[in-house]
């Protein structure tokens, strides 16, 4: 058992190292390009997203139900065949892509009402999607491990997500010279995001994706100031700007590629600027948005 676990850890370390190398090779202006996948069956497979050649990270979305009923979890990937995702994860990782799983989302049924609920969710994530193995535990993606967890908490209370972040991050002590479990967050652009501020205060998040959409507190004229506030508040995290790939997602928040490229010339001067997160693969496939960054 110990040898198998060591082999699994070494394998994941190699994959993640390749992903980090891919990140370093991205455009100096754009940085990392992260795409949300799993919101529309017509977006194509995860493998197709990785073969598009425009993304360094794909976030599978969402684990949309947890916490309300102990032991009850729901993975919602909009009708995609779950059994096909595992092989696609391994294929994407072999191409140097990072694959994250987002928890939460819009319209799900989730919360962490207690410390025990945080422990239970940690165990579910570790044994069902990450590097843990336990007899009798169903793994939706088979023997494929995602590279980390994104906290996409869009409803409910703030309590206990800080505890979950600490438990997930603590696994990194088992990995040498690399990050074994990435811990990231997708926040609203208005500072602070009260649902995630306690979790972010741990200082353990590798990345923060700041959504410049679905939040009336961030009109177009304030985007630069909002991003810089987040970047300066969390200097230990790589901070990415979150945008939509089409006005059909959020007409008021949509920035054409030329407008985003202009903004990037200023915000990429932040020392912890990380790149761009785009909602989502379906709309990016239709519009070719990221091809112009």
Curated annotation (Swiss-Prot):
One Gene Ontology cellular component: extracellular region
Induction line: Induced by exogenous treatment with ascorbate, dehydroascorbate, citrate, sodium chloride and methyl jasmonate in roots. Induced by wounding in roots.
Keywords assigned by UniProt, alphabetized: Disulfide bond, Plant defense, Secreted, Signal
Listed transmembrane segments: none
All residue ranges annotated as the GH18 domain in the record: 31-293
Cystine residue pairs: 50-92, 189-218
Job description of the protein: Fungal xylanase inhibitor. Possesses competitive inhibiting activity against several fungal endo-1,4-beta-D-xylanases belonging to glycoside hydrolase family 10 (GH10) and family 11 (GH11). May function in plant defense against secreted fungal pathogen xylanases. Is similar to class III chitinases, but does not exhibit chitinase activity.
Protein name from the UniProt record: Xylanase inhibitor protein XIP
Gene: XIP
């Amino acid at each position: 058992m110990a040898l198998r676990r060591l082999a699994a850890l070494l394998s994941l370390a190699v994959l993640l190292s390749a992903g980090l190398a891919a990140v370093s090779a991205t455009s100096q202006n754009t940085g990392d390009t992260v795409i949300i996948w799993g919101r529309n069956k017509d977006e194509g497979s995860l493998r197709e997203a990785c073969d598009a050649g425009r993304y360094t990270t794909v976030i599978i979305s969402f684990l949309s139900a947890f916490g309300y009923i102990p032991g009850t979890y729901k993975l919602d990937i909009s009708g995609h065949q779950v059994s096909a995702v595992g092989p696609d994860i391994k294929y994407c990782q072999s191409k140097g892509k990072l694959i994250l799983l987002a928890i939460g989302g819009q319209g799900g049924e989730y919360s962490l009402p207690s410390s025990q609920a945080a422990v239970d969710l940690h165990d579910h994530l570790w044994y069902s999607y990450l590097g843990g193995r336990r007899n009798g535990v169903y793994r939706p993606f088979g023997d494929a491990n995602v590279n980390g967890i994104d906290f996409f908490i869009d409803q409910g209370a703030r309590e206990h997500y800080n505890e979950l972040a600490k438990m997930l991050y603590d696994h990194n002590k088992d990995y040498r010279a690399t990050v074994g479990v990435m811990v990231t967050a997708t926040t609203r652009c208005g500072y602070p995001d009260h649902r995630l501020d306690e979790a972010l205060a741990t200082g353990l998040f590798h990345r923060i994706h700041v959504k410049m959409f679905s939040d009336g507190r961030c009109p177009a004229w304030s985007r630069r100031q909002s991003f810089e506030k987040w970047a300066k508040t969390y200097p230990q995290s790589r901070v990415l700007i979150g945008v939509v790939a089409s006005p059909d997602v959020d007409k008021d928040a949509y920035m054409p590629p030329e407008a985003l490229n202009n903004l990037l010339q200023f915000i990429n001067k932040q020392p912890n600027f990380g790149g761009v997160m785009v909602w989502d693969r379906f709309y990016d496939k239709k519009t070719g948005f990221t091809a112009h960054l």
